[in-house]
């Protein structure tokens, strides 16, 4: 399926659901799918979603008309989901599912996620890492790439090489 008529909707009120989103956007054309992305554990909205129109031209109209408008009291951002600014979409995908996988791996290693959480305090996580050899490698690999890791792009590189050190 093509992403042509698919719009990314960001900045949603956490109370906004599929029905209210569909109500707001349906005046621009026939909608084939509305998704509000929810947290798997808490089932609460994560503040963004997608609206897919049958006709890509309707999606463009909706994007022009709704970007920056308020829905349920919050200003939303509307963007095409599939175009080259889709690296934003990649960021969300990577940040949610990829990030969760990263934590899962960390937890299995006995608290590797602590290093991830405190990566801002490099000296502190360095202190943690001193006790075990594998952790040492983990923090040193981290210090050079902590920016990319957070963006959701290059964390996979350090994660993959991390896995081969077992």
From Swiss-Prot:
Methylated on arginine residues within RGG motifs. Methylation by prmt1 promotes cytoplasmic accumulation. Cold-inducible mRNA binding protein. Acts cooperatively with elavl1/elrA to stabilize AU-rich element (ARE)-containing mRNAs by binding to them and inhibiting their deadenylation. Essential for embryonic gastrulation and neural development, acting to maintain the expression of a set of adhesion molecules, and cell movement during embryogenesis. Required for pronephros development. In adults, most abundant in testis, ovary, brain and liver, with lower expression in kidney and heart. GO terms for molecular function: enzyme binding; mRNA 3'-UTR binding; mRNA binding; ribosome binding; RNA binding. The lineage of its organism: Eukaryota, Metazoa, Chordata, Craniata, Vertebrata. It is found in: Nucleus, Nucleoplasm; Cytoplasm. It comes from the Eukaryota. Residues 68-166 are annotated as: Disordered. Gene3D superfamilies: 3.30.70.330. This is Cold-inducible RNA-binding protein B. Keywords: Cytoplasm, Developmental protein, Methylation, Nucleus, RNA-binding, Stress response. Interacts with prmt1. Interacts with elavl1/elrA (via RRM3). Associates with ribosomes. GO terms for cellular component: cytoplasm; nucleoplasm; nucleus; spliceosomal complex. Induction: By tcf7l1/tcf-3. Its main location: nucleus. The keyword RNA-binding applies. It comes from Xenopus laevis. Residues 133-149 have a biased composition (Low complexity). GO terms for biological process: cell migration; embryo development ending in birth or egg hatching; gastrulation; mRNA stabilization; negative regulation of nuclear-transcribed mRNA poly(A) tail shortening; neurogenesis; positive regulation of mRNA splicing, via spliceosome; positive regulation of translation. The glycine-rich domain, which contains a number of RGG motifs, is necessary to regulate nucleocytoplasmic localization. Residues 92-115 have a biased composition (Gly residues). The keyword Nucleus applies. Residues 157-166 have a biased composition (Basic and acidic residues). Residues 5-83 form the RRM domain.
């Amino acid at each position: 399926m093509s992403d042509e008529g698919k719009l990314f909707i960001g900045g949603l009120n956490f109370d906004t659901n599929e029905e209210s989103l569909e109500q707001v956007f349906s005046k621009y054309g026939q909608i084939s799918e509305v998704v509000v992305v929810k947290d798997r554990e808490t089932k609460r909205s994560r503040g963004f979603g997608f609206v897919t129109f049958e006709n890509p031209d309707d999606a463009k109209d909706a994007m022009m008309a709704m970007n920056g408008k308020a829905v349920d009291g919050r200003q939303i951002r509307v963007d095409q989901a599939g175009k080259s600014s889709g690296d934003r979409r990649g960021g969300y995908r990577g940040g949610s599912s990829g990030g969760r996988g990263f934590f899962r791996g960390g937890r299995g290693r006995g608290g590797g996620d602590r290093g991830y959480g405190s990566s801002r305090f490099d000296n502190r996580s360095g202190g943690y890492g001193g006790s075990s050899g594998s952790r040492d490698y983990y923090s040193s690999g981290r210090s050079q790439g902590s920016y990319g890791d957070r963006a959701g792009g290059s964390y996979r590189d350090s994660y993959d090489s991390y896995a081969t050190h077992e």
